[in-house]
Amino acid sequence: MFFWYQNHVIAKLLVWLLFPFSLVFWFISVIRRRLFRLNWLKSYRSPVPVLIVGNLSVGGNGKTPVTIWLVKQFQSRGIKVGVISRGYGSRAEYYPYLVKIDDNPTISGDEPLLIAQRTGVPVCISPNRQQAIELLLAQFNCDLIISDDGLQHYKLQRDFEIVVIDGERVFGNGFVMPAGPLRELPNRLAEVDLIINNGKLTGYSNTLMLLLPKFAVNLVSGEKKLLRDFQRIPLNAIAGIGYPQRFFNMLRDFALTLEKTQSFQDHQDFDAVHFSYFSSNQPLFMTEKDAVKCRPFAQANWWYVPVEADIQGEEVERFMQVVSQQIKEKK
């Protein structure tokens, strides 16, 4: 919500109006987690290690690029990975559902489809994470399960936890939902194995992730062009991600001229009507996550910008070694 990251009078008023509800949310969350830790509520232990990639706050913090980066890193170490996701926005006829790389994103969800296309590993979506893991292990020889999101899904026991923090917005006003963006308070960070800062260091760790664009890809032809090839052309841009401004800022950092921009809600289900606002004579840029949903009605001058995560820091290398060693020992 807009007021989570603002400091004007109306934002403060909304915070205090919603604060009693935040107290209730926080209390229920604390009690619920305590019941899981005491085994009063049942949880599932996977026969292979589980790594959770999550966050403390609502909205796009960069979990999916981290998941893709992790999969590729473990693949380079000879570790077979399976990915599970709740599949937010998916409308599969049944669950658990194994994502196919040519799926319609309305069936699989945009992020699971993107992970499957970028990595080639098996991806299974289901609100029931246990069923997703069991299906993956029944059909694939996985050494490691990575859960894209699910830090607060305590029905699933985990061996490792990664939290991704938005380096620009961090934790907003610092309140838990609905007065603020937090699902859990920052003291939860003391319990996780690795903290990754997206874009800027925050003081919570020295591990930094940069999302590096290399080129633009045409949605119709597949042609690739360097971003600098568009520097003298007025462009339009859309983004249906958790923090659209990050995408627009990235394009401007490459000296691209954005004439019109349009932000959509995260996981927006696009159709051609959403783009009637833009001139068909100008290039339209979008994220790769948005592109998987726009291909059926894409025009000849629509482009998406894939990014590669570059994660730096001694902590991440130590983390990778610890996880790899545990997997080898379990084998």
UniProtKB/Swiss-Prot annotation:
Q: Give, as in the UniProt entry, the pathway in which the protein acts.
A: Glycolipid biosynthesis; lipid IV(A) biosynthesis; lipid IV(A) from (3R)-3-hydroxytetradecanoyl-[acyl-carrier-protein] and UDP-N-acetyl-alpha-D-glucosamine: step 6/6
Q: Which SUPFAM superfamilies match?
A: P-loop containing nucleoside triphosphate hydrolases (SSF52540)
Q: Which GO terms describe its cellular component?
A: plasma membrane
Q: Which reaction does it catalyse?
A: a lipid A disaccharide + ATP = a lipid IVA + ADP + H(+)
Keywords attached to this Swiss-Prot or TrEMBL record, sorted alphabetically, are: ATP-binding, Kinase, Lipid A biosynthesis, Lipid biosynthesis, Lipid metabolism, Nucleotide-binding, Transferase
Is Ribonucleoprotein given among the entry's keywords? no
Gene Ontology annotations of biological process type: lipid A biosynthetic process; lipopolysaccharide core region biosynthetic process
Disulphide bond pairs: none
PANTHER family, A to Z = TETRAACYLDISACCHARIDE 4'-KINASE, TETRAACYLDISACCHARIDE 4'-KINASE, MITOCHONDRIAL-RELATED
Q: Summarize the protein's role.
A: Transfers the gamma-phosphate of ATP to the 4'-position of a tetraacyldisaccharide 1-phosphate intermediate (termed DS-1-P) to form tetraacyldisaccharide 1,4'-bis-phosphate (lipid IVA).
HAMAP family xrefs? LpxK
Report the family membership: Belongs to the LpxK family.
Protein known as: Tetraacyldisaccharide 4'-kinase
Organism (species): Histophilus somni (strain 2336) (Haemophilus somnus)
What lineage does the source organism belong to?
Answer: Bacteria, Pseudomonadati, Pseudomonadota, Gammaproteobacteria, Pasteurellales
Give me the gene this protein comes from. Answer: lpxK
